[in-house]
Amino acid sequence: MSLWDAIVIGAGPAGIGASGLLAENGAKVLVIDEAPGPGGQIWRGVEDVSDARARILGSDYLAGRDEVRRLRASGAELSFETQAWRVEPEGTVWLKDSHGIRRERGRRLLIATGAMERPCPLDGWTLPGVTTVGGLQILLKREGMLPGGPLVLIGTGPLFYLFAAQCLAAGMRDLSLIDTAAAGAIVSALRHVPAALTGKGPSYLIKGLKLLWMLRRAGVDIYNHSGDLRIKSAADGLEVHFRMREVEHRLSASHVGLHEGVIPETHLPRALGCRMHWSEAGGAFHPHRDIHLQSSVAGVYIAGDAGGIGGATVALLEGRLAAMGILASLGRPIDELLLRATRRDRAAHLAARPLLDHLYQPSPAILTPADGVLACRCEEVTCGEIRAALRAGCAGPNQVKAFLRCGMGPCQGRMCGMTLTSLAASTHDISMGDAGFLTIRPPLRPISLGEVADLVEP
């Protein structure tokens, strides 16, 4: 077991920004990521992307190339295709890679695991041909491929519209969008417009308007404020049934992509016992962080979307802020001018975030699905079974887990955890924060007893 000044978990924008700066300032840094290379989800495969594919994915994607090169040149130790399956508050990280199990120790830990797509259980979401928009985008980034049309995208959020525009750039024309954003979202978002017009906010708004203009110009059908969604099997693929303005609609599809925005990936912070709070605007639990981005657990820092959704640029800046906080805590000198400038840049890039959070709030119907909808895919538990357990006396997600095994499968509650919280809140008429969340215990990823037994300490 080696001792590092810092272990960075995640090699997306936040992990890249942090580990590069740490290593450049003489810190001994280990960076781990489950992917084959750096970049995270947003910059996946950017090192070897073709020019043709880069044009499809856009300038924001290609901006990651220079950051990845800086990481490679920084001197940080990079360990890819590596899973962190157990993390301990004092800095011990249990890792699994192609060589087996090993332990590493960090004087400081930085969690930069990014975001995950908000699970959106609805009738038919487990059918063949139904996947997430994020999954389809990974296919485009890694292989330059898209499924054959017609393709129907269901959901809302910036990534929802970005991927639709990328589909157009890749040559797909048989495309329809069903926007599920809450009907009153625009009204609730209006009060945040003035703040969004400050700092870097206008650049984000212009980018979004350009995406919508591209889709409208191409004649893509967009069905706004839709509900009562159902996906059914059909002889030639899939059928999507929904209601818009009290009118029933039906679309044929070969594939369906689901997306209800992204939320922080908080399994590691929760496993470490970091204090969490419910963000009403973000619609998710966020870890508490101080001005240095340190969590409530001493020595554990959280940067990027894992601490709150802000996008790639904010994640990169937060990685650098966390790195400076770590350096200062280790007694290393930091550039105070750079620190202040980075904080200003971060605030400028977050100016439009409240507007976006309110504009793309998911519909309540998505958060509390019908009884017949499968909530836990791993253990095949329906929303009706969860409601019955809650009415029978289960206080919240953890008691439901004990009775029905929700959250005990391979995904460890990543797919059903938010639904459990939503159903507990609605059934008991309490807030999401009071309903709470699943307690996370190691192993965080599936691992065999044989692999643990084969652990050999150097």
Curated annotation (Swiss-Prot):
Gene Ontology MF term list: oxidoreductase activity
Keyword list, A-Z: Oxidoreductase, Plasmid
EC number(s) per entry: 1.-.-.-
Any Pfam family the entry gives: SO_alpha_A3
Top-level taxonomic group: Bacteria
Enzyme class at the top of the EC tree: oxidoreductase
Biological pathway: Opine metabolism; octopine degradation
Assembly and interaction partners: Heterodimer of a subunit A and a subunit B.
Family under the similarity heading: To T-protein and to dimethylglycine dehydrogenase.
Protein purpose: Oxidative cleavage of octopine into L-arginine and pyruvate.
Protein name per the record: Opine oxidase subunit A
Organism, scientific name: Rhizobium meliloti (strain 1021) (Ensifer meliloti)
